[in-house]
Amino acid sequence: HYGKYSYLSFVGDAPTNDVKGVWASSDSPLVWLNPERGSTRVLAGLPAVTALTELPPKYLAANLARHVEKLTDAGLLGRGITQVLSPRDEGIEGAARYIQGEFRRIGLQAIGGSYLQTWQATLDNGKVQQLSNLVGLIPGSDPALANQPVVLGAHYDHLGLDERGIPFPGADDNASGVAVLIEVAAKLTRAFTPVRPIVIVAFSGEESGLLGSKHFVSSPPSALGDVGFYAMINLDAVGRLEGRKLQVFGSESAYEWPFMAQGIGYTIGVESQLPAQTIASSDHVSFLNNGVPAIHVFSGLHTDYHRISDSATELDYEGLSGVASWLEEAAMYLGQRSEPLRVTLANAPVVVAPLGSEERGASLGTVPDFAYFGAGVRITGVIPDSAADAVGLRQNDIIMSLNGQTVTDLQTYSNLLRTYAIGDVVAIELNRGEEIVTVTATLTARR
């Protein structure tokens, strides 16, 4: 009746309107400009508002960094299992002592009175080497589930020294995983009582063929009794998340894994990606091969993998804090679940590690994209000064064949590379956008 006014005033009993009008509001955030009227007015934006306070992260970057910096100290000689020590160096034994001390500090129970699981392992070169896993326990409350523990694990060994005698730091691989393992175990010990036990393990000998996890699965500590492992989560290279989705390998081994990962993403905001393959060079495979549902949590490959440049300063500690929160949620889900998982191990394919291993001398130097599901192998980058770098391979190239042999997936790519030697010349067919490109590369030693 009156139209739109900013103010109206009335007098008398009738009442009678005596004043009305519209305030000028050229930049009010309440103004709406009808786009059909073609107005040229520019409204001021809303001022930035700072929150009164912010919650600190559940897992502090400084605590995670403290573990990483200790485990990457040069005196540990790259945490190699066969390094000869000088009087001033601790080697991998120093890393083991540090982890034992942390297990004791945070209140993990020592199984059978000791955190050490020590045995004699025969290496590929025939040498017999004493190795030690570090094992701690968070007891469960239900006696009926006492022999069905969840295992949370991360390997603490690395590559030792390079040919110049310089230690490989192994910050992402795998000081990052051990740091998360310790911090999450500390939180669970303080604030969570699971119905089934949770076993915390730092494995040795992963880089030499999963020696620690194979021994743990085949010969678990006797104090655990007649154990049947319920499930296993493996932390390996979780320090370079950098805003990406967390990769979870092996999710096909139990029906519940994808739903658990999805639920955790909704709860804490750390999203997961479930690649349809498993990296065969990490410790969860020892459990898969023994019928235990197991997943590998992974932040993604990078060009510092197995290089001197994999240092503590390169890690994403904010992302590492998110990984720790993810693991805590997963451990609580499994630890308070009394029903068995619906095991689907037949659906969990295993592929060989694609970026090179001690057994394969020749290397192309590509960084594969595990999230790619199409034909061939898409690469996310190349190792500097590698064969791939020399011939101009680049991000998003898709490798379709090697010497005329079709590369259907990461499995075949890995298998084909293992048939070549250093110095072999390989014709590589690429899909580069809309173009098919062929280049010829001379394979080199791993760098």
Question: Each predicted region: which residue ranges?
Answer:
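C-terminal recognition in membrane/secretory proteostasis and scaffolding
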Residues: 1, 326, 335-447
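Short beta-strand elements that form the blades of beta-propeller/WD-repeat-like
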Residues: 6-8, 22, 29
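N-terminal hydrophobic or amphipathic helices/low-complexity stretches enriched
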Residues: 31-93, 99-101, 106, 147
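His/Asp/Glu-rich mid-to-C-terminal helical/loop segments that flank catalytic regions of hydrolases
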Residues: 32-33, 303-349
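Second-shell loop/turn segments in exported
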Residues: 50-59, 75-91, 120-124, 164-174, ...
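A non-catalytic alpha/beta surface segment that caps or lines the substrate-entry region
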Residues: 79-139
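Alpha-helical metal-binding/catalytic segments enriched in His/Glu/Asp
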Residues: 136, 152-210, 327
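Metal-dependent peptidase/peptidase-like ectodomains
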Residues: 193, 203-302, 313-320
